Curated annotation (Swiss-Prot):
Any one GO molecular-function label of the UniProt entry: structural constituent of ribosome
GO biological process: one example: translation
A GO cellular-component term linked to this record: cytosolic small ribosomal subunit
Residue ranges, compositional bias (Basic and acidic residues): 7-21
Keywords in alphabetical order: Ribonucleoprotein, Ribosomal protein, RNA-binding, rRNA-binding
Name of the protein in its database record: Small ribosomal subunit protein bS18
Gene3D superfamilies: Ribosomal protein S18 (4.10.640.10)
Assembly notes: Part of the 30S ribosomal subunit. Forms a tight heterodimer with protein bS6.
Disordered: region residues: 1-32
InterPro entries named among the record's database cross-references: Ribosomal_bS18 (IPR001648), Ribosomal_bS18_CS (IPR018275), Ribosomal_bS18_sf (IPR036870)
Keyword Ion transport annotated: no
Alphabetical list of Pfam families matching this protein: Ribosomal_S18
SUPFAM superfamilies membership: Ribosomal protein S18
Length: 106
């Protein structure tokens, strides 16, 4: 029975924010207290502009979708839709194979 009393005291401390180095306040600030951040939805540039095509022979356009280290940038950052992201990855790999884009940058 004693261990149950100790555990219940520990649980009370954690709920109040006193235990384990907490600041003593609630675990998280209330969301209603501050203004929520509105993030604008990203639109795929290839879907928005039908004239823009993915071409492995265009390293200037492809370099927008690779980092300075040579890695492909994920679609959640660039805003490219899934079908165009697949085409982009194929185009980047082709451009790397024929030495239009670097595999890695030192």
């Amino acid at each position: 029975m004693r261990w149950m009393k100790i555990m219940s005291e520990d649980m009370k401390q954690e709920q109040s924010g006193e235990g384990r180095g907490g600041r003593g306040g609630p675990a998280r600030p209330l969301a209603s207290a501050r203004r929520p951040f509105f993030r604008r939805r990203k639109v795929c540039p290839f879907c928005a502009d039908k004239g823009l095509k993915i071409d492995y022979k265009d390293p200037k356009m492809l370099s927008r979708y690779i980092t300075e280290r040579g890695k492909m940038v994920p679609s959640r950052i660039t805003g490219v839709c899934a079908p165009h992201q697949r085409k982009l990855s194929v185009a980047i790999k082709r451009a790397r194979n024929i030495a239009l884009l670097p595999f890695i940058v030192k």
